[in-house]
Amino acid sequence: MKFAVIVFPGSNCDVDMFHAIKDELGEEVDYVWHDTENLDEYDAILLPGGFSYGDYLRCGAISRFANAMKAVQKAAEQGKPILGVCNGFQILVESGLLPGALMRNENLKFMCRTVQLRVENNETMFTSQYEKDEIINIPIAHGEGNYYCDEETLKQLEENNQIAFRYVENPNGSVSDIAGIVNEKGNVLGMMPHPERAVDELLGGAEGLKVFQSILKQWRETYVVNA
């Protein structure tokens, strides 16, 4: 399986994402600059955290216009797994690939610590290696991670089982404790916590690795078993 890590000006978690795929998952991965127009050779697309374009205007508001996002949109339409973490989640929302918005944290402070998440839906291509309601420890590092959507959108997220992760103790004011959501098709996941920073027991825990293992399992079942 071949992954692409999209690198925007100001990305700073791309190296962590690359390490998670290459060294921990053991799969092929490339850094791909934001001006690329073709992602056809990749099986999965990863949008890392950071401060793309300095977070000017709004987090992700400029990145959504990058050439690469047209290719990401195409990949999403093709059903390829798209994972956006932290700033990557913000970019997915700004691009319209996921509903809602990310606002300033409720306490108006940047937050950097490990939090507990509850796996709400383990039937997605990103969460199949977890148990439903499993509690996992994943780091956060954000100033604008307060997820918001209107009541109708929240109702749709609930009814369609699109909420992948919830905070056990809400750190930022996100509506309904939401930490991560998928699109209706189930192949686009956005989450504020950083699973790529929780892939090595020597560095504090590996409970985020299952996100990437789930992607790999889905791909193998689809393209290897059926080959």
Curated annotation (Swiss-Prot):
SUPFAM superfamilies: Class I glutamine amidotransferase-like (SSF52317). GO terms for biological process: 'de novo' IMP biosynthetic process. Residues 3-225 form the Glutamine amidotransferase type-1 domain. Keywords: ATP-binding, Cytoplasm, Glutamine amidotransferase, Hydrolase, Ligase, Nucleotide-binding, Purine biosynthesis. The active site is at residues 86, 194, 196. It catalyses: N(2)-formyl-N(1)-(5-phospho-beta-D-ribosyl)glycinamide + L-glutamine + ATP + H2O = 2-formamido-N(1)-(5-O-phospho-beta-D-ribosyl)acetamidine + L-glutamate + ADP + phosphate + H(+); L-glutamine + H2O = L-glutamate + NH4(+). Its EC number is 6.3.5.3, 3.5.1.2. Its main location: cytoplasm. It comes from the Bacteria. GO terms for molecular function: ATP binding; glutaminase activity; phosphoribosylformylglycinamidine synthase activity. It is found in: Cytoplasm. The keyword Hydrolase applies. Pathway: Purine metabolism; IMP biosynthesis via de novo pathway; 5-amino-1-(5-phospho-D-ribosyl)imidazole from N(2)-formyl-N(1)-(5-phospho-D-ribosyl)glycinamide: step 1/2. GO terms for cellular component: cytoplasm. NCBIfam families: FGAM_synth_I (TIGR01737), PRK03619.1 (NF002957). HAMAP family: PurQ. Part of the phosphoribosylformylglycinamidine synthase complex involved in the purines biosynthetic pathway. Catalyzes the ATP-dependent conversion of formylglycinamide ribonucleotide (FGAR) and glutamine to yield formylglycinamidine ribonucleotide (FGAM) and glutamate. The FGAM synthase complex is composed of three subunits. PurQ produces an ammonia molecule by converting glutamine to glutamate. PurL transfers the ammonia molecule to FGAR to form FGAM in an ATP-dependent manner. Part of the FGAM synthase complex composed of 1 PurL, 1 PurQ and 2 PurS subunits. This is Phosphoribosylformylglycinamidine synthase subunit PurQ. It comes from Bacillus thuringiensis (strain Al Hakam). The lineage of its organism: Bacteria, Bacillati, Bacillota, Bacilli, Bacillales.
